[in-house]
């Protein structure tokens, strides 16, 4: 097992990507290369950046990848809002995704703070 796989925040990011894939399966076929693809790519980017960042030799470098992962998470929030407004995402689906985003955001913020506050 790689070290990043032991991180609870990485495990939660994988779960979040699963949630995004499940929810976007219900989107119209016309969005296959639009919001569906964008949301999935952004969701996958979260765990990918955590994995890549964990390989860096310094804590500030890892923290930068956590920051990028957070940006990807915020992309998903924006895309979910658009999806809801367009009628592709139900209120229940949106709330489920938003709640998962809030949890993931707190975890990413905590990891970033710990990386920047700890000695290298």
Predicted segments with their positions:
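Amphipathic alpha-helical assembly/interaction segments
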Residues: 1-120
């Amino acid at each position: 097992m790689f070290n990043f796989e032991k991180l609870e925040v990485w495990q939660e990011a994988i779960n979040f990507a699963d949630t995004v894939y499940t929810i976007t399966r219900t989107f119209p076929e016309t969005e296959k290369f639009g919001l569906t693809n964008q949301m999935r790519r952004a969701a996958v980017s979260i765990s990918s950046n955590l994995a890549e960042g964990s390989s860096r030799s310094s804590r500030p470098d890892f923290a930068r990848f956590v920051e990028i992962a957070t940006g990807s998470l915020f992309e998903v929030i924006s895309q979910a809002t658009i999806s809801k407004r367009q009628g592709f995402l139900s209120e229940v689906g949106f709330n489920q995704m938003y709640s998962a985003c809030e949890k993931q955001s707190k975890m990413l913020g905590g990891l970033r703070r710990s990386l920047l506050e700890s000695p290298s």
